[in-house]
Amino acid sequence: MDTEREALQCTAYPEVQSFCQRHGLAFEVVDLRWGIPNTQATDYLTTELCLEELERCQKTSIGPAFVALLGDQYGPCPVPRRIEEKEWEALRAQLTSRPRDLELVTRHFQRDDNTIPPTYVLQPSGSLVVPGPEEATLTSVLRGGAQEAWRLGLISQEQWMCYHRSVIEWEIELGLLSSARGDQGATVFLRDVQDLNKHILDDCSLKMVDRLVDGCLDTNAQSLLSGLKGRILDAQPGALKSHHLSWSRDLVNPKNKAHARYLKQLSEQFVARTNHQVLEQLRELELARQELGWLYQEIRHHLWQSTESTKVFCGHQELLAQLRQQLRQDESRTHTPLVLFGPPGIGKTSLMCKLAQQVPELLGHKTVVVLRLLGTSKLSLDARSLLRSLSFQVCLAYGLPLPPAQVLEAHSRVGHFFHTLLHTVSQRNFESLVLLLDSVDDLDSICHSPRVSWLPLKCPPRVHLILSTCSGQQVLHNLQQTLKDPSTYWEVKALSGSQGQEFIQLLLAAEKRMLSPGQRDVLWASLPECGHPGRLRLAFEEARKWASFTVPVPLATTAEEATHQLCIRLEETHGALLVAHVLGYIVSSRYGLSEAELKDVLSLDDEVLQAVYRDWTPPSKELLRFPPLLWVRLRRDLGHCLVRRPVDGCMLLAIAHRQLSQVIQVRYLSGPERAKRHGVLAEFFSGAWSQGIKKLITLPLVGKPLNLDRKVAPQPLWFSSTVANLRKLTELPFHLLHAGRLEELKQEVLGNMSWISCRGISGGIEVLLDDFDMCAPHMNSPEVDLVREAIQLCGPAVELRGLEKSVLYTELLARLLFFAASHPAMIGQLCQQAQSWFRACPYPMLVPLAGFLQPPGGPLRATLTGCHKGITAIAWSLEEKLLVVGTQDGAMVVWDVEEQQVVHVLMGHTAEVKCVRVFAQGTLAISASKDHTLRLWSLLSGQEKVTILDGGSQNPTEPQSWDLHVDERNNVVYSTSGARINMWNLETSKLVFCITGDVSDPWVCVALLAAQGLLLALSKGGQVSLWSSAMGKLQEKHQLSSIKEETPTCAVSIQSRARLVAGFSSGSIALVSAGEDRLLEKLPEAVGFLVVSEDDSLLVAGFGRFVRIFLADSQGFHRFMASDLEHEDMVETAVLGPENNLIITGSRDALIQVWSLSEQGTLLNVLEGVGAPVSLLVRGGTLVVSASRKSSSFKVWDLKSTKKLQSPTPFLDRTGLAAVSHHGSFVYFPKVGDKNKVTIWDLAEGEEQDCLDTSNEVRCLEVAEQAKLLFTGLVSGIVLVFPLNSRQDVLCIPPPEARKAVNCMSLSKSENRLAIAYDNIVLVLDISPGDPCPAIEGPTYTFYTQLPETIVSVAVLADYRVVYGMSDGSLFLYDCACSKVFPLEAHGSRVSCVEVSHSEQLAVSGAEDALLCLWDLQACRGMFEMSYENSCCRGVRCACFSRDDKHVFAGMEDRSVTAWSTVDGTLLAVQFVHAVINRIIPTSNGFMAPTSHGYLIRERFQCPSVRASQQDPLKNFKKAVWLVKTRQREELAAAEASQDAEPVAVEGKESKSNKRSQVCLIL
């Protein structure tokens, strides 16, 4: 059946493989007789291995496990390899009468007394004299003896069958006839050649039937074959697939059309049958699928591994007893985790597994035991996956809510959740929890970080954490740096000599083996007093192969020597080259290789194939593969040296023992060999030689190059639209890197958008970043660094919408387009790939045409989110590089900012944390909370050292100030809360003194003047008090003399001058000291905060939207700059740079502004906070953390960060008034620090081109693109018009009434009408062509709204109709020509924008209630209400129509852009742009919009005429709801019914000609 097998291999197997891959399944064909000579194919060992492989297939395959090709040959009957003693005696008794036959049998078999019971073992034929022709064959002799013994009842029928069954019948019996699955996993393809019996003697049929040695037909074999076919037909008719062929002399000739047709039908039927079986099993699995099936599979895997590890357990009883006692002692107290350590192979794993089995008996049957043998499965390979699976299992075990999706999206949050979960479990005070994590040194990340950030340094009561690791490794050192208590560490020592011998005996007994006394002597002599279980197991692996007649050789005395000895034995048996390459590939792989992958890789290795086919030629002229039998033989001899681990949906083989891996590295992967192994693996996982691509090779017996198909698995990125090739994604970058193929790595992986999106979507952003982190240090490529940072910046958008292609492509394209031209090799190619994907995308999509999102290379270091409420306090531990965060829910979280990981979750406070101070060289922190406790923490151990009940008012509504002052020299802390000052001794936790003030006049601030030994306090009523800081004795009390009738709002101490600077409710700043006070400055508004520099040379005062800087002098402080620093919203906080050359300020509008003090307050940068008011800015070195009370996230900024690659400088508009001209070449906005001027920003150059003086504050801006005019509406009510081609000329439009500020303006689509809106007045003017600039005439019409509310948005049409929206949500259409108003249905809140379509048939209005309304202006009625709500932020900021009026684009309050259909109101696309946009301008194919980040969005909107699935791009959009309501109502009645709201027309059309006098020309 060779032609059939080759046909299936060439055509059927690849098709089934692709089918399985599309369903997320691996497909492996096991045909051990392919590629080897017939003498090996019929070898007794081959038969045994075939049956073993069949059993393995039945255990692992969910679909077909067995396929038989049955023709007209029954095949040879193999001789049993082993015959048990009782059966041997029965056979021998039947042969006593035939001495020659008996002598033949005894010559081939030798007794082995080392088996239990003893057996007779067939000896290899090469060691025997070949029997003469007169002797009966061994097979026939044994058959005769078995026949007689069975007849006499001495052996069973099953034993009799062992001598009469051929290989094919053995396999069909095991694979089909005796299988519990029946025909569900098995198929027999039967080839029936008609009229064959008529041609049985023809030469051409010699190979088609069984024949005897003399060439005669073997009738016995043919009879057995007929019986086998009958059994199959009777027992499993559904599994039998018959193919009837007519006889012909060239039946097996490939050129025979009938035969070719048969082969085609066979292949098609094989594919159909196999695919059907796979689908049937998939349906059953789907019905039985559990929601958390992945978790249950993980748990089962580790339990099975545990059972295997403890099958033979010996020794360590004393250590187990000590561990049990320690667990009992720790049960009711806070304690450190336990760490078991010892050299590799000492028995740590079996000890951990044994302890896991004994824990329930020790701590109670309700104890929850969670065991992980790390590194043995995909979910235990890295800390991120490990914590995820542990959290799920613990939550399930205790009936707690499962981790939410937001937690699982970031490793830092999973770590925080895990820490919190342990405390939650402890507080239940019921069931104990024991976590056992074996081999933490096998975690991917733990070796590379000096701090094990995910590890809880203290376990709460009833929670136990036990780890094991190897001694002498970097991991143990890292653990010792994290867990510093010596009692944490328990050494696992070697067994005693007697225990070592007992261990060997137990291993032999488990295998039903024993040793002869002489062999035992040799074994013990080789292992004098050896108690190392790993070494003992290696010795056992050698000794268990000894038969009683084997003369043993001395074994190696050390584990390393024994490992080398094992390799030598394997090389002698299987060939040095094959062993070196097989083991080299397994060790070189990232996590291991599946058997199918290994066989494919060996089929690509020319050196291996040339060695294999040295003595015979391959069976096929079309394809070349590695003979799988050679691998199975080697795998069998490797035995326990290999371990199977489930990874990426496959069962991978890896080296079980670290010692063996190290020896393989030294022995087989030194020098260039390592790069060669990685190179072949890279070729395989890249798919370079798959899908019919042939590879040249020269085989020894051929002598000429052969170009043959290696038939290896294809390696696409996606097997189907939902199934990614995880194995390729995991392995390829690793092998390209270590093969030194860095350019290929850059082009095909790190610089390939298809790769990036596939890796990100299938594994998540953090897995994608891990790949970049692995490769970047070896590449020295700024481009790679930029792409990595760009991916990291995608985080917020991914959390909002989920990681799907459109999000990732948009995010990266909009960030990397800045660098596409300057770096075309990698970034340019990435951008082109993204653009090509967008062009082919069948869904409505917003496509970036230029960079507009924050580019990589900027100051943002990280955005971190914890599992807690808003952040209320932050402190740095610079020495330990830690950040301590206090939160509203009382949690204290310690972050390693560099690793971006949670180090500790400090649980103790039950209410909001108000204040945190770090001291003792960054090792201790003390916190104050609304729960009126002080808690002292060790930042190294995470342990709470002291709890102090600090007292204070229990009235939650009473306004109080909290503060802490640590005096390290005296080891005391001063806590202030309301009207109480307490001094506590940190060593004894004793109260030293308590100062109680007037409850009705609490202290606003208290300063510790350490140098003077004073406490200085300022009360709400302005009373100054001084006490001795040592004894708390009152020394002075007086009322402020310089400030009257003002309340203190904030204060800061000036330690170098022993003074206090206080801010007051009416803007006063006073300098307060012992015995005196004086007014320092009077600010226009209440002082919100005060900040002083580290050297006391600068003072910062925040008031309203402004910040003022003061410089220290001999008298106190004087103003540093003439102008104040200005925000657009209330300034909340500020911090000074490390050298006083920068100041960073934060405001309620979530913006952070960076100013240069060395350049007199020049604004350097505007940064986006966390989307909530910036309430905290804290600096540590050059890093600044920004946080908010309303967000659980915080951002880390690097002040010294310089741009890695130059990108355009953003324009610094903070007003949201930016206007755009010249098709996006120039941007106009009020000048920073001087709103009486308008900055003209050149986007191409990234610099200010000019500045226009308006003499008054600018309130709004509009650009007439065609007319080239800039309209500036001022707070004075004047509108200045600047011709853009001659900016020295200015037109002035005066206001209708004095001191009325311009609220908004609008131009008609044809730019021939201008509407200017004030609070309740609208002017409509005409714009007509003129020379040198257009003429502005009018106002042609003026009307009043007659409403108390103000106009906030306006739009004008060419026919003098005006649509305007009010502050209360009202919306009106006013026809100036006929002086009529048409009320449109009101919004529920302030109207934020009104826009008219280009045809002026439609209008769209947006409001702060997130509602967009589409209006038919001809019928004056609503068409659609389109609502879009985000759970965090609601509202519409701006909108516009596309040029063809088919779509509406809207800028939303949640920093996203939406696209809607005007035909049916459908939401077509949503794009998160990270920034607020206040204006959208339509372009020919999309829109452009200036952002609050200072970039101009340019996007193309592509909307296929037939939308494939209009909601598909929105399927993952989280936390948002959109709704469309169709409006069906009659046209509105005439406006008489609402005359009270009708505007009053002041000027009519006829007055148009005499209005020019109101416009003056300024030269």
Swiss-Prot record:
Domain (NACHT): residue spans on this chain: 336-666
SUPFAM superfamilies associated with the record: P-loop containing nucleoside triphosphate hydrolases (SSF52540), Tricorn protease domain 2 (SSF69322), WD40 repeat-like (SSF50978)
Ranges where the record places region Disordered: 1534-1563
Location(s) in or outside the cell: Cytoplasm, Cytosol
Annotated WD repeat ranges: 274-314, 866-905, 908-947, 954-994, 998-1037, 1044-1082, 1126-1165, 1168-1207, 1212-1251, 1253-1292, 1346-1385, 1386-1425, 1431-1470
Assembly with partners or alone: May interact with HSP90AA1, HSP90AB1 and BAG2.
The name this protein goes by in its record: NACHT domain- and WD repeat-containing protein 1
Organism in which the protein naturally occurs: Mus musculus
